[in-house]
Amino acid sequence: PQCDSLIARTVGSQQMLTCAAPGYLVQHGTPQSPDDLARHQCLHFLHGGRVSRWRFQQKGKETAFQGCGRFSADNGEALLELALSAFGIVQLPHYLVQTALDSGSLKSVLSDFQPKPVPVMAVYPSRKQLSPKVRALVDMMGEAWGKAV
């Protein structure tokens, strides 16, 4: 919904990564393209009760995928735990999965189709009513997110 009294400012971006546990991939195979996901258990994030679409870059353009799976949740950490337990393939922000990828607990899949980074937004009331503390927080978020990514 659009609200004229709110301002949205991009403070950073996050890369979404598609991954699965090695055990899941041994049992079900490794998808070679986003189309292959239709034959896999996908662990989807819920936004407002709706299953989110996964985004991919394919042949220079962005495509979306909304598959089916045994589980969906509105909690990234819960989806991460399900993926680590070999329940399916998940697409989550890099900051949630990077440690598991580094340790080998998860394997990246479809890296040739990696989507563009997703913007991280700070949403706040109109600048007319913006307190110095809120302005400082939003500025700090932009600086911190830029260093973290």
Task: Provide a role label for each language-model segment.
Residues 1-73:
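Acidic, Gly/Pro-rich loop/turn segments at junctions of secondary structure
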Residues 22-23, 77, 95-96:
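Alpha-helix/helix-capping structural signal
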Residues 72-82:
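Short, surface-exposed, low-complexity cationic segments
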Residues 2-8, 100-110:
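Ligand-binding "clamshell"
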Residues 94-99, 103, 113-149:
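C-terminal effector-binding regulatory domain of bacterial HTH transcription factors
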Residues 80-105:
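A ligand-binding cleft/hinge motif common to bilobed small-molecule-binding domains
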Residues 9, 35, 80-81, 135:
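Alpha-helical segments flanking ligand/cofactor-binding loops in enzyme cores
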